[in-house]
Amino acid sequence: LVLDYLVSGKITAGTAPTNTGSKSIEVWAVGSWDGTNWPSVFDGTDSDETVTSADIKASVCRFVAAMACDTTADRSYFFGPVSLAAVFGGTLPPKFVFFVTHNLRTTTPTGVALNSTAGNHQIRIQPVFQTIN
């Protein structure tokens, strides 16, 4: 029986972020309430999602970590380890997914994407078990 997961990882910025003001990459966890159904736009798969509003994000996502970002292109930002049970208030949901957001910008109004190489992003979970001697 898994009691908890320690989550850690790295997310890599894209090219040429200008980052005027406070910029960050955030990692959020979203739980399924029954192992099948998911809140809002989430579906339990590795896919792009657009949350309807900041209020919806605040109600269905649980904050895991934030990484302050600078103007260095292709820099990896690391986080964790963080107790996932603590993120969900002490108990793990039946299933969960991670949701990454950022507000990095370039000099163009369209912003900057995160690094496009999949291997430059990692989110790892390490199970925590109870050991009885």
Language model features with spans:
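Extended alpha-helical scaffold domains
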Residues: 1, 75-77, 110-114
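A short beta-strand element within beta-rich, extracytoplasmic domains
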Residues: 2-18, 98-100
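Short coil-to-beta strand junction motifs in C2/discoidin
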Residues: 19-27
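Short glycine/proline/serine/threonine-rich loop/turn segments at secondary-structure transition edges
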Residues: 20, 86-95
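Predominantly extracellular/luminal cell-surface or secreted proteins
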Residues: 28-36, 101
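Acidic Ser/Thr/Pro-rich low-complexity disordered segments
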Residues: 34-61
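Extended, solvent-exposed segments with strong compositional bias
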Residues: 51-90
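C-terminal interaction-tip segments
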Residues: 92-95, 101-133
